[in-house]
Amino acid sequence: ASAYLDMVARLWEGPIILVGHSKGGNLAIYAAMNADPKVRKRIQHVYSLDGPGFPPEIVTSPAYRTIQPKVTKIVPSSSIVGMIFETPEPCRVVSSDSDGIMQHSAFTWLLDGDQFITEPDLSSSSQLFNEELNHWIATLTPEQRERAVDALFTVLASQDYAAIQGTLESSYQICMSHRVDHR
């Protein structure tokens, strides 16, 4: 991602704004963190649209701390994907005309003219689910974390809503059993 950003930056001399949805939001932040220093100076802002965060070792790194002031994360009120891992950057919570994981589609986010309709915070169910999911993810090895996140994105990319709902119900049961077993 950073090599691609550096290549495109050679074709454009002006200021740069990066935007990505889902895994693309994560990659936009990653690219900004790892871009050539001259390119990094041209980055005005990075928008992550319901993109996952990063593990603690990344968000505490100097590269992340350098780019963090330029990052805004935009998530729907029932965000799951955008709240995976650490999310220290400011989040704008937006309204959606869908429920649950279906809010991940930015096409469901509500607008008033050319502005998002915002909410004061994530829904309480989203906050609880994300707390438990991230607690469970923290117990995984890096390889297991990578496989778990890749599996989630594979299911999301398939747009098989029954599979997505089943995956979330299983994840919820795993998280809640982990909560009972480990508290």
Regions found by a protein language model. Name each.
Residues 2-15, 37-183:
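Alpha/beta hydrolase fold serine-hydrolase catalytic domain that processes acyl esters and thioesters
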Residues 27-37:
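Short glycine-enriched nucleophile-adjacent loop
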